[in-house]
């Protein structure tokens, strides 16, 4: 018998808008989210304190508050252990903060077998809805498969309180989908890797909505579009069962920068934006590259290695090393298989084209 449908993991509740966090009590009262109405809240050690003061006024007094020092595997395991050993029997975990808190909480919730509600306070990357937790470990960092959040809340009032850089980074992150999708399609042609058409359509729609939007981070309409795009991008990974719709040569270059030059590493989305633009230029899609460069420039995002604080030779090192960060993944970098001297020439040409 033909398959009539397929099951797709997706959030039960999504709220995006100014003041959306005020709906959190009602969301947590939903029995699909929390059966008993007892929940723990994970926050960062820094800005999380002020967020606790803002949110605690509308939440029950018996909420358990837990701080997360950083997004490391050890801290995520420790968070799960502290919640498990708490006197109150919590049945839901709420993560309030940026990607680091949410990633640690996603991993902790998976260990505990709890649903997670993600309350994002910035728009730096698409991890808020993805089935992946990126955590620091002894080898540098690792990506861990976890269930996607059961609820997503993005309060644009809280987003506006974040440093602008943490919003702009999400623009670079979402534009990198266009590079990732081109790499996925390239792999399909060259290696026979299957492309999930629905996931690809979702990832492309997310990127195009930001690429074509004339507004900026000061516009509520643009923030709403960016928030929706990041949710859609994260969901595309859940549909595909892989990070392929959002991760290609762009993310390989990003991971290489993180590993080779950790003290110079910038925001994830900033590095992915530059990596995506370079890979698109390398692919020869110069029309799309010009569009991406214009959008990155308009939103005051990095475009060249020097904008990231890297010299040409350092960026060449990162591009040369990039394929080693994701063994088995086929992108334009693996396809061209350039020598270091060829990469050096390509980077010099890229800088000459896009330097401001």
Residue ranges and their predicted role:
Residues 197-306, 310:
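Active-site segments that bind and position negatively charged phosphate/pyrophosphate groups
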Residues 86-108, 112-121:
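A short, small-residue-rich loop immediately preceding and capping a beta-strand
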Residues 3, 7-8, 174, 285-356:
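C-terminal charged capping/lid subdomain of soluble metabolic enzymes
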Residues 11-12, 110-206:
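A glycine/threonine-rich phosphate-anchoring loop and its flanking beta-alpha core
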Residues 1-92:
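ATP/NTP phosphate-donor binding region
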């Amino acid at each position: 018998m033909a398959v009539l449908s397929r099951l797709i993991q997706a959030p039960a509740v999504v709220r995006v808008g100014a003041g959306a966090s005020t709906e959190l009590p009602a969301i947590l009262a939903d029995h699909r989210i929390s059966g008993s109405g007892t929940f723990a809240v994970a926050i960062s050690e820094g800005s999380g304190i002020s967020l606790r003061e803002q949110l605690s006024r509308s939440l029950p007094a018996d909420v358990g508050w837990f701080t997360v020092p950083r997004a490391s595997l050890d801290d995520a395991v420790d968070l799960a252990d502290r919640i498990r050993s708490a006197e109150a029997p919590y049945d839901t975990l709420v993560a309030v903060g940026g990607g680091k808190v949410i990633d640690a909480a996603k991993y902790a919730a998976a260990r505990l077998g709890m649903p997670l509600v993600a309350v994002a306070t910035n728009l730096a990357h698409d991890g808020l809805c993805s089935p992946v937790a990126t955590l620091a470990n002894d080898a540098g960092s690792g990506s861990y498969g976890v269930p996607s959040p059961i609820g997503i809340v993005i309060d644009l009032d809280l987003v506006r309180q974040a440093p602008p850089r943490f919003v702009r980074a999400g623009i670079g992150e979402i534009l990198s989908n266009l590079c990732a999708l081109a790499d996925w399609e390239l792999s399909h042609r060259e290696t026979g890797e299957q492309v999930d058409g629905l996931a690809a359509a979702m990832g492309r729609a997310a990127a195009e909505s930001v690429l074509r939007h004339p507004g900026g981070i000061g516009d509520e309409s643009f923030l709403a579009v960016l928030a929706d795009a990041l949710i859609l991008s994260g969901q595309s990974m859940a549909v595909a069962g892989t990070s392929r719709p959002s991760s290609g040569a762009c993310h390989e270059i990003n991971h290489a920068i993180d590993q080779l030059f950790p003290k110079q590493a910038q925001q994830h989305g900033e590095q992915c934006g530059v990596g995506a633009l370079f890979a698109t230029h390398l692919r020869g899609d110069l029309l799309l590259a010009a569009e991406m460069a214009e959008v990155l420039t308009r939103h005051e995002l990095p475009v060249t290695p020097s904008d990231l604080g890297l010299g040409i030779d350092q960026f060449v090192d990162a591009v040369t090393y990039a394929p080693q960060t994701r063994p088995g993944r086929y992108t334009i970098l693996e396809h061209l298989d350039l020598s270091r001297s060829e990469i050096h020439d390509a980077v010099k040409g890229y800088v000459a084209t896009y330097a401001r």
